């Protein structure tokens, strides 16, 4: 069984939008009340409470406050679950010695989703029925693909001025036919990916492409008066640009991952610590724009659902070592290390000559096969010496 998230666009009327926003506002107030309740109990009596203890307060709150009564009971219980998860994450970070980040109160407009964990929703032919204010509300939806499988949860999310519904469904595994091919991937900034067979995936640079337009919209927004009509219009333009960048990046990452999963049975990637790499102020913006972490997460998810294997290896020295003979320029006895500006690999020992990123991708593939698939051949992706061989063009 596999769990998927199916996302659809909702088109609520003005009245339905008001009801959704009122529900979000009520859930925000309940969330803040639960956080304050935990803090108050600990400060006064040194007592730690769990989500089940706090959920027992909801029946009384429903009697005292009509706004709380209008919210479905399953949605209220999910609010308590979110508070509990926030505190659990806080204590986990404290125990690990990380910066803890105490759970904060949600400001107005900062609570953007509600979840029906078990009941309170129904999917129609072109509508989604949600239980709000004590009765079902039929909201028009664009169901661009059928909801196949067992629906476990339903989440309604506000994204700017748009509304979406997300269904978590369980489906039977649909594995792709077995594929013997193996490939190594080297993430970069000049090219988004370099493959061990000599192919490249261009870096689209979505943020860089719209950076000037984004800066112009930001300057225009700062010149408007707060809480004015002009400020709301400027915010709308700014959010649309960010949404466009996000959607383009999301589409590119998913399509690239899907093509790789369809072609290869074993995919070797680098285990990059992107958070530390962002400390380089010269490359931080480009690294963030490349979205390597998102790509690896999507690739792993698609590989699992297709019965493919993704192997992450330590990227240390993969760009320095020669993929043909293993020669490493350690800086001693004239062995000059390659700089970041050196984009071509030439080995003084075996005379191997190839692109620097392709050389790294071959080393990544060899590390993955040596550690996890001993005795497995490279199936035409690389030769026995580890040098790239010709392969069909990989176009995206």
Predicted region positions:
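Gly/serine-rich nucleotide phosphate-binding loop at the start of the catalytic core
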Residues: 1-76
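Positively charged, low-complexity nucleic-acid-binding target-recognition regions
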Residues: 3, 285-286, 290-396
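Stable alpha-helical structural segments in soluble proteins, enriched in small hydrophobic residues
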Residues: 34, 79-90, 358-368
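Substrate-contacting helices/loops that form the catalytic groove of nucleic-acid
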Residues: 40-66, 148-153, 158-296, 374-396
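Acidic carboxylate diad motif detector
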Residues: 52-157
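Short polybasic amphipathic segments
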Residues: 121-132, 191-195, 343-346
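Short acidic-glycine loop/turn motifs at beta-strand connectors
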Residues: 124, 159-160, 196-199, 325, ...
């Amino acid at each position: 069984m596999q769990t998927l998230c199916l996302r659809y666009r909702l088109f609520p009327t003005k009245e339905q939008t008001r009801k959704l926003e009122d529900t979000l506002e009520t859930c925000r107030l309940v969330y803040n009340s639960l956080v304050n309740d935990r803090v108050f109990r600990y400060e006064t009596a040194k007592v730690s409470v769990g989500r089940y203890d706090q959920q027992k307060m909801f029946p009384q709150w429903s009697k005292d406050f009509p706004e709380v009564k209008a919210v479905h009971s399953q949605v209220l219980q999910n609010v308590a679950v979110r508070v509990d998860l926030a505190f659990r994450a806080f204590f986990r970070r404290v125990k690990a010695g990380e910066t803890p980040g105490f759970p904060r109160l949600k400001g107005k407009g900062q609570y953007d989703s509600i979840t029906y964990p078990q009941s309170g929703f129904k999917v129609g032919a072109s509508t989604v029925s949600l239980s709000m204010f004590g009765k079902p509300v039929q909201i028009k939806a664009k169901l661009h693909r059928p909801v196949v499988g067992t629906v476990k949860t339903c989440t309604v999310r506000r994204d700017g001025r748009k509304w979406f519904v997300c269904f978590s469904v369980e489906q039977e595994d649909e594995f792709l036919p077995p594929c013997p091919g193996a490939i190594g991937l080297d993430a970069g900034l000049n090219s988004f990916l370099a493959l061990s067979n000599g192919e490249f995936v261009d870096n689209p640079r979505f943020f860089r492409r719209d950076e000037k337009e984004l800066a112009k919209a930001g300057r225009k927004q700062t010149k408007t008066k707060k809480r004015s009509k002009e400020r709301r219009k400027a915010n709308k333009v700014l959010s649309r640009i960010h949404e466009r960048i996000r959607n383009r990046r999301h589409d590119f990452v998913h399509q690239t991952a899907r093509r790789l999963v369809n072609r290869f049975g074993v995919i070797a990637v680098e285990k990059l610590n992107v958070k530390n790499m962002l400390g380089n102020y010269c490359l931080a913006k480009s690294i963030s724009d490349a979205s390597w972490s998102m790509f690896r997460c999507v690739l792993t998810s698609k590989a699992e659902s297709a019965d493919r294997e993704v192997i992450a290896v330590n990227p240390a020295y993969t760009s320095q070592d020669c993929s043909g003979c293993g020669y490493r320029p350690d800086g001693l006895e004239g062995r000059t290390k390659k700089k970041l500006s050196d984009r071509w690999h030439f080995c003084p020992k075996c005379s191997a000559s190839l692109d620097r990123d392709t050389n790294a991708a071959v080393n990544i593939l060899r590390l993955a096969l040596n550690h996890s698939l001993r005795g497995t051949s490279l199936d035409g992706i690389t030769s026995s010496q580890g040098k790239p061989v010709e392969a069909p063009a990989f176009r995206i």
